[in-house]
């Protein structure tokens, strides 16, 4: 009889993309896979006809006044009822949670159906939903060994498996990376929401570098309202550019880059490390539990990146840091060597081994 796994996840890129990657893996292995997410996450899987999905609502009850907390709990309660209906209908063999508040209801309800729950944490600190779910999960799988605010009592069921990236990234050949192009290519990644500050600070810095006589090619993600002005700026200054809001062929963009300037979502930084792309990390200052800074700090401690805090993210500091990387090719090569020590190409096999006793 074919085994069935329900994957539950929040709808942000850092949650939904690892979930989709693992769903594709188990689907190819012959499992039935279903997704429970919010409307944002559901938009990402519309093109996957093989995946059945359910949309739930969920809100965080934290940092709200009493009335809004009450409304949030009503939303969560309604999603718990819907989760009971889903589990009775689908009769899965395993629940696999990726965090985000929408993952909480069905993961919580799984306890009362005696279903094994596995949770996965992509960041260097346990997210709030995963923190609650850790209590009754069978195993906690983590991308990296978490030591920050991690409950000691859960360490016995915690296993490091690595980042669940697209297999094209995990399996790509390092020889495809072209670090000797005529133009020095810089990739700007603002995360799933874009980053307005990148659109303000980066273009004048690229102009300054271009004026120094260096041939620069810029590949820049931006928010929609900035796109026309950024494109016109680069065109006016004769700077080769590709400016985009979203591009599904992100691997090709990464592979064509010598350096990245990026927010610090766990998946994005892991993709850069797997493709040996040195990066300047600019953590989102208001990320939940400061997880973006902690993600970046892990890689900085392992010699894989530079950190430039948003308070210090100005044209002078960014110009000096980029110029340092352009002039010192040995430093870039040292970072690439460090990156080779900081990824796991066997993540899918390791996950299979960790869950096989439950399915």
Each model region followed by its residue ranges:
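A short, well-ordered alpha-helix in the C-terminal region of glycosyltransferases
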Residues: 331-345
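C-terminal "capping" alpha-helix adjacent to the active site of nucleotide-linked donor transferases
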Residues: 302, 306-309, 313-330
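Donor-nucleotide binding loops and adjacent catalytic segments primarily
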Residues: 24, 36, 41-49, 173-260, ...
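Acidic donor-binding loop of glycosyltransferase active sites
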Residues: 92-94, 239, 255-270, 277-278
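Conserved nucleotide-sugar phosphate-binding/catalytic loop shared by glycosyltransferases and other
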Residues: 4-10, 27-75, 161, 190, ...
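An amphipathic, basic-hydrophobic alpha-helix
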Residues: 65-94, 112
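Active-site-proximal region of nucleotide-activated glycan assembly enzymes
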Residues: 4, 32, 40, 51, ...
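C-terminal alpha-helical cap of glycosyltransferases
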Residues: 344-359
């Amino acid at each position: 009889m074919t085994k069935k796994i329900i994957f539950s996840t929040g709808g942000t890129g850092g949650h939904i993309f690892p979930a989709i990657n693992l769903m594709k893996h188990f689907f190819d292995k012959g499992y039935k896979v279903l997704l429970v997410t919010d409307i944002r996450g559901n938009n990402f899987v519309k093109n996957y006809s093989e995946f059945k999905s359910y949309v739930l609502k969920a809100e965080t009850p934290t940092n709200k006044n009493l009335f809004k907390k009450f409304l949030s709990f009503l939303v969560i309660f309604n999603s718990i009822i819907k989760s009971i209906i889903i589990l009775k209908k689908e009769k899965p063999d395993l629940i696999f949670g990726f965090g985000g508040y929408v993952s909480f209801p069905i993961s919580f309800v799984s306890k009362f159906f005696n279903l094994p729950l596995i949770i996965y944490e992509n960041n260097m600190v346990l997210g709030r939903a995963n923190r609650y779910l850790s209590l009754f999960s069978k195993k906690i799988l983590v991308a990296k060994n978490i030591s920050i605010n991690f409950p000691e009592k859960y360490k016995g069921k915690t296993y490091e498996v690595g980042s669940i990236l697209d297999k094209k990234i995990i399996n790509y050949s390092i020889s495809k990376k072209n670090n000797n192009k005529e133009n020095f290519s810089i990739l700007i990644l603002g995360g799933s929401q874009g980053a307005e500050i990148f659109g303000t600070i980066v273009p004048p810095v690229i102009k300054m570098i271009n004026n120094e006589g260096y041939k620069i090619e810029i590949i820049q993600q931006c928010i929609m309202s900035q796109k026309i002005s950024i494109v016109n700026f680069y065109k006016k200054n004769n700077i080769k550019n590709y400016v985009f809001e979203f591009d599904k062929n992100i691997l090709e963009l990464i592979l064509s880059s010598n350096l990245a300037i990026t927010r610090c979502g766990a998946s994005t930084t892991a993709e850069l490390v797997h493709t040996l792309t040195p990066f300047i990390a600019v953590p989102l200052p208001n990320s939940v539990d400061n997880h973006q800074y902690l993600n970046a700090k892990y890689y900085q401690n392992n010699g894989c990146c530079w950190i430039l805090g948003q308070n210090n993210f100005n044209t002078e500091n960014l110009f000096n840091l980029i110029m340092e990387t352009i002039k010192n090719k040995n430093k870039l090569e040292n970072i690439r060597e460090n990156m080779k020590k900081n990824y796991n190409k066997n993540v899918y096999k390791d996950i299979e081994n960790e869950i096989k006793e439950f399915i």
